[in-house]
């Protein structure tokens, strides 16, 4: 098979906590691409089963029976230390552990997987979905992240893209992507708010759009708030109710918890459209008295009460975003709802309360982010003209200075890309080196902010304290990823650092993961080929057995026996798990024998036709052997040609019975 040619398309991927989506520009319009399963979004789930890696719907289907090896909502762990994810760990059935660097990783049967590797598996699925649609190899992408993702989380997402074999041309915030999708065909100036409550995170962004310019004025959010937390309150309610009814605690039963997770998600979705829902989980557990069943009714009012504190948590970030944008709620022309949780009526009511107007429901909350990413891909690829995106950083960036103080160099909501410089000096006489501790956050003391990197500037010439001139430069690229340098003016010595993900993935680790991903891709391809060959062989057995049954009396007995022998050979090859080549060879042999059925049937049809013709002319009813005796032939003369009409001999015809 010839290799696919490389595509010049830059695809847009919404790498979501719960679901992911891929889109591409086609004929100047963004198009969401359906997966091989026919769905426009793919569950962001990766599972390991029987030596095989499952992604998306196949992974979700087996989650109940394989909870410890089914990794869902892994986006909540990307770019974060183990010490930062205590609340998230409580909500998942799989094992989260710290690696040697203190990063949050997943322990599946003593093998550690980083969140970047799992994210890469989902991105590969999105890449393959786009390739199947385009018929070309895709190498470039725009990937979205929550607006409130910090520098480490953004860098980790970009690393996941690299592991998946993608050149990530841009990382853009999800609300910004949604605004692009909404405003690409709008005329006039507008100020809009994008309220994005997804599976794992909450973002609010205020933008000004007009004449193709999309300027983010401010952004805020909560990376610990999302649909998973809403599922969690329903799960806890079910656990409490079941314990009251049966006296059994299901919280330590991972298989039961996975069933409750699925039931909670289903109930949550249903309650956006109905006032109450039935939750039935038969045989949820068993005790000495026999099997136990869970049967509960949850009303929308109950659910809203259970989730009230979560909904309340969306208010403060919205107020802060408006304040940072120097706007009031009445200045906002439109409010976009993004993310599956924005469908919840109580959430929509709070949005109306905050902004004083009905939110816009004209965009698909599940697809709008991927569409915006595809538009940005079109901008970068030159397919979309006259669009300028001005984004901002969500959190202030600075360094630790004397007394453990956080000194910001770049304030939050500064438009990017940007570069900021500031002169610092030493705190002691003849200080030979300084340690630059890079921080992200809004607190005045360094220890209360997130340390995202550190490096040393050494060999500073001896000088009294306060004399050395050390220029620190913060350079933030369009992806919101930070590069820091420090230079001593006297010696000219300079030290630079690209702030890497808190996961601490080094270049050699990323390259190894890329190689591993390619290896698994080849293994998965071989497994699929083997599965396809087995399925085809099974189909061949079925067709052969049906043909023998249907035509048993109409084909020679020796052919029936021959086919049955080859059916058994194929069945044995499948049973013994023979090589793909061996199964295919046995299947091909059976296929060849199957063709003989057709030949035998054709001969029989010809015989029947000849008999009918003879009968029509008043001739006798003769069998095929007799037909051979009654056949006639034409023979060209020696040296002549059968097509030569000048030398045609009379046919030799042997007449057995003269018709009356």
UniProtKB/Swiss-Prot annotation:
Task: Fetch the CDD domains from UniProt.
Answer: ASKHA_NBD_HSP70_DnaK-like
Keyword Transferase among record annotations: no
- Coiled coil regions, renumbered to chain: none
Entries under InterPro entries matching the protein: ATPase_NBD (IPR043129), Chaperone_DnaK (IPR012725), Heat_shock_70_CS (IPR018181), HSP70_C_sf (IPR029048), HSP70_peptide-bd_sf (IPR029047), Hsp_70_fam (IPR013126)
- What Pfam families does the record tag this protein with? HSP70
Q: Which SUPFAM superfamilies match?
A: Actin-like ATPase domain, Heat shock protein 70kD (HSP70), C-terminal subdomain, Heat shock protein 70kD (HSP70), peptide-binding domain
For region Disordered, the annotated ranges are 599-660
What does the record say about induction? Answer: By stress conditions e.g. heat shock.
Q: Does the keyword Cytoplasm apply?
A: no
Keywords for the protein's UniProt record, in alphabetical order = ATP-binding, Chaperone, Nucleotide-binding, Phosphoprotein, Stress response
Superkingdom of source:
Bacteria
Recall the GO molecular function terms of this protein's record.
ATP binding; ATP-dependent protein folding chaperone; unfolded protein binding
- Locate the Phosphothreonine modifications and list their residues: 201
Q: Where is the composition biased (Low complexity)?
A: 600-617
**What family classification does the UniProt entry report for this protein?**
Belongs to the heat shock protein 70 family.
Task: State its role.
Answer: Acts as a chaperone.
Which NCBIfam families does the record associate with it?
PRK00290.1 (NF001413), prok_dnaK (TIGR02350)
What is the protein named?
Chaperone protein DnaK
Q: Which organism is it from?
A: Chlamydia trachomatis serovar L2 (strain ATCC VR-902B / DSM 19102 / 434/Bu)
Q: Which gene encodes it?
A: dnaK
């Amino acid at each position: 098979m010839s290799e696919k040619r490389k595509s010049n398309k830059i695809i847009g991927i919404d790498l979501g906590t719960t679901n992911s989506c891929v889109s591409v520009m086609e004929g100047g319009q963004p198009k969401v691409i359906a997966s091989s399963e026919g769905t426009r979004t793919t569950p962001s789930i990766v599972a390991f089963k029987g030596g095989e890696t499952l992604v998306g719907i196949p992974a979700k289907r087996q989650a109940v029976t394989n909870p410890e090896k089914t990794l869902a909502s892994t986006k909540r762990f990307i770019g974060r230390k183990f010490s930062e994810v205590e609340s998230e760990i409580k909500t998942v059935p799989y094992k989260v552990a710290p690696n040697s660097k203190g990063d949050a990783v997943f322990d599946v049967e003593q093998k550690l997987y980083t969140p970047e590797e799992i994210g890469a598996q989902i991105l590969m699925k999105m890449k393959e979905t786009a390739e199947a649609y385009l018929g070309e190899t895709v190498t470039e992408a725009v990937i979205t992240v929550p607006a409130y993702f910090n520098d480490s989380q953004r860098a980790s997402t970009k690393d996941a893209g690299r592991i998946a074999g993608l050149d990530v041309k841009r990382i853009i915030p999800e609300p910004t992507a949604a605004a692009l999708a909404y405003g690409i065909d709008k005329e006039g100036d507008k100020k809009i708010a994008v309220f994005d409550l997804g599976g794992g995170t909450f973002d609010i962004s205020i933008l000004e759009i007009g004449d193709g310019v999309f300027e983010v004025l401010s952004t805020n959010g909560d990376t610990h708030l999302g649909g998973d937390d809403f599922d969690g309150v329903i799960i806890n309610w079910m656990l409490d109710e079941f314990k009251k009814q049966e006296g059994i605690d299901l919280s330590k039963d991972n298989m039961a918890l996975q069933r409750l997770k699925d039931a909670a998600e289903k109930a949550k979705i249903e309650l956006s459209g109905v006032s109450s829902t039935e939750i039935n989980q038969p045989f949820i557990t068993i005790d000495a008295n026999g099997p136990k069943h869970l049967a509960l009714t949850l009303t929308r009012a109950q659910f809203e009460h259970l989730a009230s504190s979560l909904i309340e948590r969306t208010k403060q970030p919205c107020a802060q975003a408006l304040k940072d944008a120097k706007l009031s709620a009445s200045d906002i022309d439109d409010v976009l709802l993004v993310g599956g949780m924005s469908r919840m009526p109580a959430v929509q009511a709070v949005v109306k309360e905050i902004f004083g107007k009905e939110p816009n429901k004209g965009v698909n909350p599940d697809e709008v982010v991927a569409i915006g990413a595809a538009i940005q891909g079109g901008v970068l690829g030159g397919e979309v003209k006259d669009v300028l995106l001005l984004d901002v950083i969500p959190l202030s960036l600075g360094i630790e200075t004397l007394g453990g103080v956080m000194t910001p160099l770049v304030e939050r909501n500064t438009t990017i890309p940007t570069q900021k410089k500031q002169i610092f000096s030493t705190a002691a006489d003849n200080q030979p080196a300084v340690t630059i501790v890079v921080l992200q956050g809004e607190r005045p003391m360094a220890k209360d902010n997130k340390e995202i990197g550190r490096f040393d500037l050494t060999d500073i010439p001896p000088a009294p304290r306060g004399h050395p001139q050390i220029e620190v430069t913060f350079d933030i690229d369009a992806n919101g990823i930070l590069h820091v340098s420090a230079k001593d003016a006297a010696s000219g010595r300079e030290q630079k650092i690209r702030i890497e993900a808190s996961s601490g993935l080094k270049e050699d680790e990323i390259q190894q993961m890329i190689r591993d991903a390619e290896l698994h891709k080849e293994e998965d391809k071989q497994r699929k080929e083997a599965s396809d060959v087995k399925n085809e062989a099974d189909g061949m057995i079925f067709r052969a057995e049906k043909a023998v049954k249907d035509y048993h009396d109409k084909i020679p007995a020796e052919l029936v026996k021959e086919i049955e022998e080859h059916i058994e050979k194929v069945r044995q090859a499948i049973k013994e798990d023979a090589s793909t080549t061996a199964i295919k060879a046995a299947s091909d042999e059976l296929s060849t024998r199957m063709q003989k059925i057709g030949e035998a049937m054709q001969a029989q049809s010809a015989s029947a036709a000849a008999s009918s013709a003879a009968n029509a002319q008043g001739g006798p009813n003769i069998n095929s052997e007799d037909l051979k005796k009654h056949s006639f032939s034409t023979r060209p003369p020696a040296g002549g040609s059968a097509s030569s009409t000048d030398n045609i001999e009379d046919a030799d015809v042997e007449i057995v019975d003269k018709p009356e």
